Amino acid sequence: MFSVNNTHSSVSCSPSINSNSTSNEHYLRILTEWEKNSSPGEERGIAFNRLSQCFQNQEAVLNLSDLNLTSLPELPKHISALIVENNKLTSLPKLPAFLKELNADNNRLSVIPELPESLTTLSVRSNQLENLPVLPNHLTSLFVENNRLYNLPALPEKLKFLHVYYNRLTTLPDLPDKLEILCAQRNNLVTFPQFSDRNNIRQKEYYFHFNQITTLPESFSQLDSSYRINISGNPLSTRVLQSLQRLTSSPDYHGPQIYFSMSDGQQNTLHRPLADAVTAWFPENKQSDVSQIWHAFEHEEHANTFSAFLDRLSDTVSARNTSGFREQVAAWLEKLSASAELRQQSFAVAADATESCEDRVALTWNNLRKTLLVHQASEGLFDNDTGALLSLGREMFRLEILEDIARDKVRTLHFVDEIEVYLAFQTMLAEKLQLSTAVKEMRFYGVSGVTANDLRTAEAMVRSREENEFTDWFSLWGPWHAVLKRTEADRWAQAEEQKYEMLENEYSQRVADRLKASGLSGDADAEREAGAQVMRETEQQIYRQLTDEVLALRLSENGSRLHHS
């Protein structure tokens, strides 16, 4: 599976293929001609170097990500992994026959070419796809979220991971028996797909929240306890919810774990103009100017739901009871009006909040404040204040651990509104863990299932993991990397060079050694996992060394400390 955070994709190794001088010259001519036709902003020079090196050294992995490329040349035929995420590609060339992994996330693709039968992982998140080609029989992972898909082709029997959220699907094809993770939230689904009725050994997690499903099939109750199914945010009737509650509360219930929300079936889709919702947070003497500014954003994506979120936020217990809350929101809205990127991120975060209960709105407010702080860090606010950046990183780390703890707690409950669980840990531990982004009150703590003992255990776990893991985590944190790129450019370049040298000289052998030691040579799944582990270990080592060097210099200058008392 391709990583979404600090590590690159796992990779797999192909046998070396000898290329003669004639084919070398021919391919280099193709690359040279392609490089000459570069458009402004493209980094085809870097791409040329990586392509020629990959071809001449018969490297299994070709990484052309983050180069603003608008097209690709003919690809080396021997590669088994192609990474071209974060470019401006509108199409892909013919794919190599032995390709196993393709990552083309965050491009402008409207179609993708015929897929080779060898492909096991396809990741084309955040493109403009309206349909997919026939899927190869060996495919185990398919990530196509945030596209424009109206339907899916038949799913391969070996498929284990399927992400299709933020599309336009009204139905899903039958689900393969081996499917473990399905993320189909935020579509237009009106019915459930056909589930496998076999007894399962592996846990299955299926997410259908925020669709248009109104009823549940009778077979739903026949599923075994290996299933975790999220149906929150669907227009389910009160009768259906009551039936589910009776079913899951039975002492002899051994069926699936079902997630719902406190306001299912009661969503209110009415909203007022965005500018009106925003100006309501400002003093009367500022409202005219604010309204004029925000009128320009009325047609941005998720503007309507953001308007509804602001109205819901004003009705939370924090808005009513917390001194200075309105001023805090107004200051935040001013920052959004000045940054299109931050506004886009915030609109997206708030998109789901109006379709659930008040505590969902409160949790979303927490997440929006996190988004603001991380954005400010990435944009340079803390470039000259490493102590403040460390404090922010420490808070983000604590929140991440609390999310892990909440996730584990949710697994112990049968009929769960998971929002209440997540918010309970943040709200009830906000003071003890110094969580500046957490609201101090919530409405439905009583139904969260979180006990006083849970909170004591959580606090102890956060502090223990912080002591042992924080510096490693911080060394891989995106905002810290952004600071290093700006303020320590030479050191950062050296670290990146170390990483690419490892990819060229050590990576394949380390993966092969790991597979051999575990007796899993030739196992594609094990190969991907081993590749991801090797890559993460390498990045951890390189970035930790860089982090230690920079922090030792900066903290000694201002008297700050890395370790928190």
From Swiss-Prot:
GO molecular function: ubiquitin protein ligase activity
EC number of the protein: 2.3.2.27
Ranges of Low complexity composition bias in the record: 9-22
GO cellular component: extracellular region; host cell cytoplasm
Region of interest (Disordered), ranges: 1-22
Domain NEL per the UniProt entry, residue ranges: 273-565
Interaction with target proteins as annotated region, ranges: 1-262
Keyword list, A-Z: Host cytoplasm, Leucine-rich repeat, Plasmid, Repeat, Secreted, Transferase, Ubl conjugation, Ubl conjugation pathway, Virulence
Biological or metabolic pathway of the protein: Protein modification; protein ubiquitination
Residue span of region Linker: 263-270
Post-translational modification: Ubiquitinated in the presence of host E1 ubiquitin-activating enzyme, E2 ubiquitin-conjugating enzyme and ubiquitin.
Catalytic activity of the protein: S-ubiquitinyl-[E2 ubiquitin-conjugating enzyme]-L-cysteine + [acceptor protein]-L-lysine = [E2 ubiquitin-conjugating enzyme]-L-cysteine + N(6)-ubiquitinyl-[acceptor protein]-L-lysine
Domain topic, free-text comment: The LRR (leucine-rich repeat) domain forms a slightly curved solenoid and may mediate interaction with target proteins.
Entry similarity comment: Belongs to the LRR-containing bacterial E3 ligase family.
Name used for this protein in its record: E3 ubiquitin-protein ligase ipaH7.8
Organism: Shigella flexneri
Gene encoding the protein: ipaH7.8
